[in-house]
Swiss-Prot record:
It comes from Citrifermentans bemidjiense (strain ATCC BAA-1014 / DSM 16622 / JCM 12645 / Bem) (Geobacter bemidjiensis). This is Thiazole synthase. Keywords: Cytoplasm, Schiff base, Thiamine biosynthesis, Transferase. Pathway: Cofactor biosynthesis; thiamine diphosphate biosynthesis. Pfam families: ThiG. It catalyses: [ThiS sulfur-carrier protein]-C-terminal-Gly-aminoethanethioate + 2-iminoacetate + 1-deoxy-D-xylulose 5-phosphate = [ThiS sulfur-carrier protein]-C-terminal Gly-Gly + 2-[(2R,5Z)-2-carboxy-4-methylthiazol-5(2H)-ylidene]ethyl phosphate + 2 H2O + H(+). InterPro entries: Aldolase_TIM (IPR013785), Thiazole_synthase_ThiG (IPR033983), ThiG (IPR008867).
Length: 260
């Protein structure tokens, strides 16, 4: 399979890019737009709290995003209870943003780890109301399986804490998740540089979502391009199939015909 016909499919929707990007922390809207463009991303996540739903006459980041070109993924960043997350998703739908949502229910302000108990409660309600739910969760295979069984369209385990840039801290859990569920697995949070994104894709993840790694870089536009390349390279390497790891050397050249 080549990358030309290798699509990311979420809830029946097809995407050419496996990189999803956020919209926060940029110096200005112009920098954000340029970074999104060179990233090649087709799915853009937006914190509902950052969108002025009550007064759309005021400038908003949505004024700078071509909604014909990109799929909007409203998220519930900043929510610490199921009730708050549910309310936020309903507001996004009522405002005409989307019912395709990234569900976040955080546990505390220091780690920004997900509160899985509240996450499961929120997911159950939102799925019953017809939302397409992509939950940000811990790298716990059991929780990911529960979310899939409930009807979530994908699972989004963290690679490391949000904004930490620590990379994929527990690749073995990610591998178990990949073996345990059939829905797309998208690493969300913790990516710091291009090699982290490539590793996630080489593991077999279906996509990577990031914000700080790009927006917080010294040159966000250049980093966005690097992430574009890394995700594509990692996916192609996964499809190609890496050689087995061995303890001892294996000569590249045949021993037959040696001189002398």
């Amino acid at each position: 399979m080549t990358q030309t016909n290798d699509k990311l499919v979420i809830a029946g929707r097809e995407f050419d890019s496996r990189l999803m990007v956020g919209t926060g922390k940029y110096a200005d809207f112009q920098q954000m737009v340029r970074a999104i463009e060179v990233s090649g991303a087709q799915i853009i996540t937006v914190a509902v709290r950052r969108v002025n739903i009550s007064d759309r006459s005021k400038e908003s980041l949505l004024d700078h995003i071509d909604l014909k070109k990109y799929t909007l993924l409203p998220n519930t960043a900043g929510c610490y209870t199921a009730e708050d997350a549910i309310r936020t998703c309903r507001l996004a739908r009522e405002a005409g943003l989307s019912d395709f949502v990234k569900l976040e229910v955080l546990g505390d302000e220091k780690t920004l780890y997900p509160n899985n108990e509240e996450l499961l409660k929120a997911a159950k309600v939102l799925l019953a109301e017809g939302f397409t739910v992509l939950p940000y969760t811990s790298d716990d295979p059991i929780i990911c399986k529960k979310l899939e069984d409930m009807g979530c369209a994908a699972v989004m385990p963290l690679g490391a804490p949000i904004g930490s840039g620590l990379g994929i801290r527990n690749p073995y859990n990610i591998q178990i998740i990949l073996e345990s569920v059939k829905v797309p697995v998208i690493v969300d949070a913790g990516v710091g540089t291009a090699s982290d994104a490539a590793i996630a894709m080489e593991l077999g993840c279906h996509g990577v979502l990031m914000n700080t790694a790009i927006a917080g870089a010294k040159d966000p536009v250049a980093m966005a391009e690097a992430m574009n390349c890394a995700v594509r390279a990692g996916r192609l390497a996964y499809l190609a199939g890496r050689i087995p790891r061995k303890l001892y050397a294996s000569a590249s050249s045949p021993l037959a015909g040696l001189i002398g």
